[in-house]
């Protein structure tokens, strides 16, 4: 089903222009740990409830400009691949190469969802002090990279970075997903 989400995002999109991919600069507040996802997670710095928040409000105008986002749309996506679409904002970026930052705000399911067996490569991370999992489709380095961030009990912020066309390495995709998660977390702390 993850491939289905990817196909839905990529359908009808192509760059039409060659270009060099540029990763979004990192501020260095994303860290990685070489641990299995079932290892205990660090305590979150604060609780950020996402109930009722518009996922398109998670990037400010300045952040959208920084990420080169020029188009946003809201559409529920089955991010958890459980046949239960969640509120998602698709943020299309038209930089040197096209991409999409999909931001989903999930209530009722915590990041422990990503700890079970699946067709995903899952790595424990920390984003701005919040426990997170970086995940991507197992066995590929060309599809996407996502971060699921523990924002409250049974709630998570998921930021997926999808390239539209060629031009991004797996590391660049994951750097961009981490940067998107970091920016969305900063904005979430100002909402509600």
Q: At which residue positions do the language-model features occur?
A:
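N-terminal low-complexity, Pro/Thr/Ser-rich intrinsically disordered segments
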Residues: 28-55
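Short, solvent-exposed recognition patches
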Residues: 66, 70-134
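A short, solvent-exposed beta-edge/loop patch
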Residues: 44, 120-192
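Amphipathic alpha-helical segments
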Residues: 54-72
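Sequence contexts marking disulfide-bonded cysteines in secreted/extracellular proteins
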Residues: 14, 55-57, 88-90, 144-146, ...
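Short, low-complexity, disordered segments immediately C-terminal to signal peptides
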Residues: 1-6, 11-37
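Extracellular/mature segments of secreted proteins
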Residues: 21, 62-67, 96-100, 153, ...
